[in-house]
């Protein structure tokens, strides 16, 4: 069974990180760090489709499953990243149940969906096994998506709802904020968690680090990103530079 699906089925929160920098070396570092999963970001990161096979191999070298955030609800792209060996797909800007259904259909082979069979890196012995194992998260990032929460959550084939706090805040008319701490954003996240639980699904989101993650776990979030390769690199540089400056 997909390790992500197994952990979530057991009711445990899971923690991962974003792989934003293109190339297998940073992906390998994250894959070997002991996270429950790694998300390769092909929407806002520097990762393009041509980078994915070696990056997926690098993450999986550490025994870690990889999820790919695709650029949009584009069935051919969704199918392709799964052919490349992704354990799951994160689809941005899903606003309606129809869009969620289109994404779900692209992740499953007939009779459950429209996924075309490709053997690029497939390790599955049957299409039924692949359909049961894949994990699909759809991102809730707009006021429209909040209005359609229950319908999106109830969509067959959708496994989780993932809050995109920055875009969601902007859609709600809030100033740019990376913490998700504004009261309307907190309320929106709690609404997503409740909708996911009503549908027997799980909720996920981006965190500002371990302390923020602990708060979100208490509020019912079970799929949480702790950071990104770029952020870890930036923090390490700043720390060492500050230490060096103190010696001058």
Say what each PLM segment does:
Residues 1-20, 126-132, 190-198:
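N-terminal amphipathic alpha-helix/helix-capping segment at the start of soluble metabolic enzymes
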Residues 13-18, 38-40, 66-69, 89-91, ...:
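Hydrophobic faces of well-ordered beta-strands that scaffold small-molecule active sites
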Residues 19-33, 72-80, 143-155, 208-214:
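Short, acidic/polar
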Residues 26, 31, 35, 60-102, ...:
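Active-site beta->alpha loop and helix N-cap motifs at the rims of alpha/beta catalytic domains
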Residues 26-54, 163-181:
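Glycine-rich, proline-tolerant flexible connector loops at the mouths of alpha/beta enzymes
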Residues 49-83, 107-112, 130-131, 181-203, ...:
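Alpha-helix-loop-beta-strand connector modules within alpha/beta enzyme cores
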Residues 74, 115-124, 134, 140-144, ...:
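C-terminal alpha-helical cap/extension of soluble enzyme domains
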Residues 76, 86-176:
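Conserved anion-binding
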């Amino acid at each position: 069974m997909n390790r992500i699906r197994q952990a979530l089925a057991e009711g445990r929160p899971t923690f991962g990180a974003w792989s934003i920098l293109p190339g297998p070396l940073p992906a390998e570092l994250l894959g070997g760090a002991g996270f429950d999963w790694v998300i390769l970001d092909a929407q806002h990161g520097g990762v393009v489709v041509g980078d994915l096979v070696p990056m997926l191999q690098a993450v999986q070298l550490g025994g870690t499953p990889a999820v790919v955030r695709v650029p949009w609800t584009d069935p051919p792209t969704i199918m392709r990243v799964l052919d490349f060996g992704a354990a799951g797909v994160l689809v941005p800007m899903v606003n309606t149940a129809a869009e969620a259904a289109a994404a779900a259909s692209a992740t499953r082979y007939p009779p459950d969906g429209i996924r075309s069979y490709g053997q690029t890196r497939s390790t599955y012995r049957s299409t039924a096994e692949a359909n049961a194992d894949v994990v699909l998260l759809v991102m809730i990032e707009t006021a429209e998506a909040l209005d359609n929460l229950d319908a999106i959550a109830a969509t067959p084939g959708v496994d989780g709802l993932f809050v995109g706090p920055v875009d969601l805040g902007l859609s709600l008319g809030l100033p740019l904020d990376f913490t998700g701490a504004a009261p309307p954003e907190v309320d929106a996240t709690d609404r997503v968690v409740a909708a996911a639980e009503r549908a027997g699904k799980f909720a996920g989101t981006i965190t500002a680090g371990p302390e923020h993650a602990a708060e979100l776990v208490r509020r019912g979030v079970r799929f949480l990103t702790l950071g990104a390769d770029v952020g870890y690199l930036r923090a390490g540089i700043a720390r060492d530079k500050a230490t060096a400056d103190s010696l001058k």
